[in-house]
UniProtKB/Swiss-Prot annotation:
Keywords: ATP-binding, Cytoplasm, Ligase, Nucleotide-binding, tRNA processing
Principal location: cytoplasm
Purpose of the protein: ATP-dependent agmatine transferase that catalyzes the formation of 2-agmatinylcytidine (agm2C) at the wobble position (C34) of tRNA(Ile2), converting the codon specificity from AUG to AUA.
CDD domains, alphabetized: RPA2_OBF_like
Keyword Cell inner membrane (UniProt): no
InterPro entries noted in UniProt: TiaS-like_TCKD, TiaS_FLD, tRNA_Ile2__agm2C_synt, Zn_ribbon_TiaS
Protein's organism: Cenarchaeum symbiosum (strain A)
EC number: 6.3.4.22
Protein's UniProt name: tRNA(Ile2) 2-agmatinylcytidine synthetase TiaS
Amino acid sequence: MGPLLQLAGTRLHIGIDDTDSIKGMCTTYLGFRLARLLQKEGAEFEDYPRLVRLNPNVPWKTRGNGAVGMTVNVSDPEAARKIAIDAVSLYSDLENGANPAAVFCEGGIPQPVRDLSREALHVMVEQERARGIIERHCSGLFYTGSGQGMVGAAAAIGYEFGDSTLELLSYRREENRGTPRPIWPEDVRGIQGAYPDTFNSYDEARGTSIIAPRGPDPVFYGIRGELASSLLGASEMVRTPERLEGYMIYRSNQGTADHLEYVIDAADPRPYSSGTISGVISTEPVVREGGHVFFEINAGGSMVPCAVYKESGMTDAAALLRGGDKVVVGGGIRRESGSHPKVLNVEFARVERLARIYRMANPYCTKCSKSMKSKGIGQGFKCTRCGAASIHRVEREIPRGISVGLYLPVASSQRHLARPYGRQGRTSRIQFDGASPWLGVFDSGE
């Protein structure tokens, strides 16, 4: 037992964000290092460290707009805060533009901080407003640079998990970062078969592994699921010759589609907001250069342009929509520019009702079940097989080629927060087992 922990300790919530840049680092890696440091000092973890994905449409995010938090019991909160601040100062990628922040709360989590977290899932939160909430309701704030990370850091503390998932993230030693990750797709392909509660490890539609990032950051791979035991077992299936530094399991809102619970105001959609819009298709879909599909929805009299991009794998279905179809779409609002209006970038579509479409056609022969032939203009129709005749063309319903139901991007194009098909209708109440190996160190290189 280290010097920070005793039976009657202080409950300390720590939130961290914006420690990375597009050139490297990852806030989850800083969380891994911080958790190790706190554990060594005897801090008691109440739950898995948390990885909270926030509004994916904010323009200044680096990759997945994820903030990290953790709740520990310590006898010396000031010493614990110093450990966290030192870690943020040491590991943040400051020279490449990171603007990190660490937020601290003691005891219970104030309701304004919870409200801020919920808001940060759907819209852009002004930094100064977040700072005011932090200074009034939290016990500490540290930041460098612009301090943009304070919004996510507070949100990581305030987020309330209803549904949740887990992610096991493994980390590379420093000398290997920036090199190709030696992972074999055939190993990854078997994970979801062996552990059905895992998800989005392999894209069957495109035949690709999707557990590893492509950039120079410290993450080697991440496996998502609902049971810690499954993640640990799945990690054993990923063979690699590379020596890794270690791993940590995070509780997360990934795979919950939590950011799409907000209903977007169709009359005045806020740029960069996330949510859903319900309405009726009002224009025929148009396929533009690149294979992207555009259409409009009439939502209570407001017309909302929508875009489905080729990379999503949903364009074939989107192109089959027709005027009068009732749909619910979810996604993010792209701001208007000189060349285009505000557009909802579609992340999912649920077709609730299909319009019935008819065309005039030659009548069928009821005896032969065959389409009759025209005898000439104004002369009616005749069956060439049995000779039966009919005078008028008939109205015939056209098969639509699309069904009522849910349409999602292929796995490799889904955002971190997207709820995959296998998690539709599910809510996971994951219990924390502090005695389980939720954090492991293989080789720190120290």
